[in-house]
Structures are given as structure tokens and as C-alpha cells.
Regions:
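First exposed extracellular module after export/assembly in secreted or surface-exposed proteins
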Residues: 3-18, 24-26, 60-262
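Bacterial N-terminal signal peptides that target proteins for export
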Residues: 25-38
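Conserved "right-hand" nucleotidyltransferase catalytic core of DNA-directed polymerases
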Residues: 40-43
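C-terminal motif of bacterial Sec signal peptides marking the signal peptidase cleavage site
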Residues: 46-50
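Bacterial signal peptide processing site
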Residues: 52-55
Length: 262
């Protein structure tokens, strides 16, 4: 993730703001087009006639989507997954900048239609999110500790979403060194009673004090997909647990199972 992304996290309000009350199953979603970082720009623009162009340029600097970059033919081309209804090839790029890897990315995009009416995605910019597989453990109670029990917060806003086979999280935690090693893993704690239980494990490697900083991480839910398909489910409820600075927390996410065999 590029350094400026951390700054953007603090400046932006949400274009796709997720409001969920942790520890309950209540979860709603709404759309907002207001960016807090633009307030000062609008104030200055009222004094200058060149405001419109400057405002348009500044809007492009802020992320307005979390997408999946899906390589084709080894990355020679790729598709951009924006939502269940919006996906297609980029209109201004050919090769995937991430090669043959499928990754989640934070981006500023615009939906377009070609001459045949097919959807294409114009990419103003994008920045990859660290993307990894959720982990299935045989002895979760014993093995969880080795993955870390440090505390972090899951940000209730843009960037925290479950879609396209991924749990993407925007998190915040205390740290002194932005470049220090830290590990975040998602553990599938499957049982007959709770088949879709997930535990977020964080190891700060000792760097768990200082100022708070935010970041993004995405987990591919392949193991959850297998369990759900085995149970004949197309939609399931994920139960996520993590250790926060206020104590142990949990929340629920509705998840539409990804099926790549279609």
C-alpha cells in the first residue's frame, strides 16, 4: 500500500459507508458522496473562478471503490470487479499491474459503456490491498496464540466489507514504526455449532504502543466457500471475533458465497 493511502483514510468520509453495530446482527449500508477532506477545498474555491476544474481534480484523488483485480491469461489482461452488477475490463489499461495475482484494491474509478453497451471501468488510480487466504487450523484453541493476541480496532466505515469471496477490513491500531513487521491473519474456527466462525489474530511483534494508524487487509474466504457449498448454502452469516482495546468484540456479516465453478 502506498504511503499516501494512509493519509487518504483520515481525510475521506465514505462513498460506501458501512454502518454496523458491533456485537449485534444489525448491519445497514448507505451511500454518501461527501468527503470531509474537500471541506477546505470548497471554502477556498468560493474565492476563485477556477474552482470547478480544481474540485474535479481533487475528487479523483480520493478512493471511491474497493475492487477485485482478476487477471486473465496470466495477467496479459484483467477484469475489474466492482459489485455483483458492475464488472468489466478496464478502458484505459491492458496488462494487470499485479501480474497473475488476484488482489483486492482501493481505487478511484468511473463506470463507462463501450459502443456495444458493454461495461468498462476507467481507472483513475488504484492501490493494492494486502490480500491473503484465511487459515483453517486443526487445533484452533492451541494454535490461535501463536498467531498473536494483540489488540486492534476494526473501523466501522469505508473499506470494511464482505463481497466477491473476500472479507476486506479497514483496521486501526497503535504503533511507533509504520515499517515494523506485523502479522494479521484470519482464522476459520469451524465447528458443527458455529460453522462460519472467524477469528482475527494480530501479532504486533512488540510494536503495539504509540499513535494510531489505519490500514487495509483482505482475506479470501475459500475455506468458508467450501464449508457453505458442502452444506448446500449460497448465503451464510459470518461471525467475526477479535480483540479490541475495549475488550473482546464480535460482529456478524451477511456473505454471498463465491462459486468459481459457474
Amino acid at each position: 500500500m502506498q504511503p499516501f493511502t494512509y493519509l487518504l483514510i483520515y481525510l475521506m468520509s465514505t462513498q460506501r459507508e458501512i454502518k454496523c453495530k458491533f456485537n449485534t446482527i444489525t448491519r445497514t449500508m448507505k451511500t454518501s458522496k461527501i468527503f470531509l477532506g474537500l471541506i477546505s477545498i470548497f471554502t477556498v474555491c468560493s474565492l476563485f473562478t477556477s474552482c470547478d476544474n480544481d474540485t474535479n481534480d481533487n475528487v479523483k484523488r480520493y478512493p471511491n471503490a474497493i475492487v477485485t483485480i482478476k487477471p486473465i491469461n496470466g495477467g496479459a489482461s484483467f477484469n475489474v470487479w466492482v459489485s455483483e452488477k458492475v464488472q468489466g475490463p478496464p478502458s484505459n489499461l491492458t496488462k494487470s499491474p499485479y501480474g497473475n495475482k488476484e488482489v483486492r484494491a482501493i481505487a478511484n474509478i468511473k463506470e463507462e459503456k463501450d459502443a456495444k453497451g458493454k461495461t468498462k471501468i476507467y481507472i483513475n488510480w488504484m492501490d493494492s490491498i494486502r490480500t491473503k487466504q484465511a487459515i483453517a487450523l486443526k487445533n484452533t484453541e492451541m494454535d490461535l496464540k501463536k498467531y498473536g493476541e494483540d489488540r486492534l480496532e476494526i473501523v466501522n466505515g469505508f473499506g470494511t466489507v464482505v463481497e466477491d469471496g473476500y472479507l476486506t477490513l479497514r483496521y486501526s491500531t497503535a504503533m511507533r514504526d509504520l515499517k515494523a513487521k506485523r502479522d494479521i491473519n484470519l482464522i476459520v474456527q469451524h465447528s458443527e455449532k458455529e460453522p462460519y466462525k472467524l477469528v482475527l489474530a494480530y501479532n504486533a511483534h512488540g510494536d503495539n504502543k504509540g499513535r494510531f494508524a489505519s490500514g487495509f487487509i483482505a482475506f479470501r474466504l475459500s475455506e468458508i466457500d467450501k464449508i457453505a457449498q458442502k452444506n448446500g448454502k449460497k448465503d451464510v452469516t459470518l461471525h467475526l471475533h477479535w480483540k479490541s482495546y475495549q475488550g473482546d468484540k464480535h460482529t456478524f456479516f451477511k456473505y454471498h458465497v463465491r462459486n468459481d465453478s459457474k
